[in-house]
Amino acid sequence: MLMFLTHFAEHVTPFNVFRYITFRTGGAMITSALIVFLFGPTIINSLRVRQGKGQPIRADGPQTHFKKAGTPTMGGLMIMTGILASCLLWANLASVYVWVVLMVSVGFGAIGFYDDYLKVTKQSDKGFSGKARLGIEFLIAAIAAFTIMRAGQEPFSSSLTFPFVKQLVINLSWFFIPFAAFVMVGAGNAVNLTDGLDGLAIVPVMVAAASFGFIAYLSGNAIFADYLQIHFVPGTGELAVVLGAVIGAGLGFLWFNAPPAAIFMGDTGSLALGGMLGTVAVATKHEIVLAIIGGLFVMEALSVIIQVGFFKMTGRRVFLMAPIHHHFEKKGWTESQVVIRFWIVAIILAMIGLSTLKLR
């Protein structure tokens, strides 16, 4: 919205500042953080009253989790309120990439909201049907993938690039759509599986958002993209503003989600944020780098896949409990040890992922 003021820059010179992505990214970050800080208590109190018993606690989970009973969920509403309001104010609304990323985030968030609603009302960890949920997620993601492919310059817009190898580019043609949809849905559900302890998911999400904000800015700048020999994707620099809003909203949410959490993110937030990261990775042509930067989320998702698959084949479990953060709790790690150590892993993986920009 503020980009509109640049039309009057000839008469009011200070309005030129809104042309700069870096300035608007900082503004988006501060704005979303303030929105969550200011409206967070009201939203939390409202959810606590409406939800009553709050998010149900898994009966087979660590004993320390039972003291969290009664904590409200759907904290993603706070996060998305901050992100959407901030993006409407600071982002360039003429960018198709901004709208696609927000569409996926809102769509996935709506699915998560319905899932959270069913869990709270039924007081059960059985929410939305898994098949129906995945079906709707893939539909939303496929529409987004098609839009991204058409918005770019073919055949590159439907191609897959690889880190470390600058010349290796594979044109997926129409197979790009199912591949990109898989990345978006996979990212959304991987973040969802990570969100099991106070503060565990939101910090790695912010780390990944900061990393991809940097990647988006570089990918959308012809000079930087040429210097680093990464693929130039016009218009994706604007996604740095969106991810700046994610970081700000994440900081605001962490204030209330710090242990002992006053509210849980819920599927409302985790699916929305994960889907957003996956969509940005697809738009910037850094899908494989997402698996590195978001390696913590990949590890959490793989632990569940391995646990379920191995149990179905042998009747035995690989981990004491899945996702893997619960395994370490069962091994005797305190919740704070698991959370902080996983944060460290997320930061290290982000640095490795960012190093791929230069190591080509």
From Swiss-Prot:
To which pathway does this protein belong? Cell wall biogenesis; peptidoglycan biosynthesis
- Which cofactors does the annotated protein need, by name? Mg(2+)
User: What GO molecular function annotation could you give as one example from this UniProt entry?
Assistant: metal ion binding
The protein's topology relative to the membrane is: Multi-pass membrane protein
Q: Does Cytoplasm count among this protein's keywords?
A: no
Q: Which reaction does it catalyse?
A: UDP-N-acetyl-alpha-D-muramoyl-L-alanyl-gamma-D-glutamyl-meso-2,6-diaminopimeloyl-D-alanyl-D-alanine + di-trans,octa-cis-undecaprenyl phosphate = di-trans,octa-cis-undecaprenyl diphospho-N-acetyl-alpha-D-muramoyl-L-alanyl-D-glutamyl-meso-2,6-diaminopimeloyl-D-alanyl-D-alanine + UMP
The UniProt record lists the keyword Isomerase: no
CDD domains, per database record: GT_MraY
Question: Where does it reside?
Answer: Cell inner membrane
- EC number(s) on file: 2.7.8.13
What GO terms fall under cellular component here?
plasma membrane
Enzyme class of the recorded protein, top EC level: transferase
Q: Which UniProt keywords apply?
A: Cell cycle, Cell division, Cell inner membrane, Cell membrane, Cell shape, Cell wall biogenesis/degradation, Magnesium, Membrane, Metal-binding, Peptidoglycan synthesis, Transferase, Transmembrane, Transmembrane helix
What biological-process GO terms show up in the record? cell division; cell wall organization; peptidoglycan biosynthetic process; regulation of cell shape
Q: Which InterPro entries does the record match to this protein?
A: Glycosyl_transferase_4 (IPR000715), PNAcMuramoyl-5peptid_Trfase (IPR003524), PNAcMuramoyl-5peptid_Trfase_CS (IPR018480)
* Record function comment: Catalyzes the initial step of the lipid cycle reactions in the biosynthesis of the cell wall peptidoglycan: transfers peptidoglycan precursor phospho-MurNAc-pentapeptide from UDP-MurNAc-pentapeptide onto the lipid carrier undecaprenyl phosphate, yielding undecaprenyl-pyrophosphoryl-MurNAc-pentapeptide, known as lipid I.
Listed NCBIfam families: mraY
Q: Extract the HAMAP family matched here.
A: MraY
Q: What is this protein called?
A: Phospho-N-acetylmuramoyl-pentapeptide-transferase
Task: Give the source species.
Answer: Brucella canis (strain ATCC 23365 / NCTC 10854 / RM-666)
Identify the gene encoding this protein: mraY
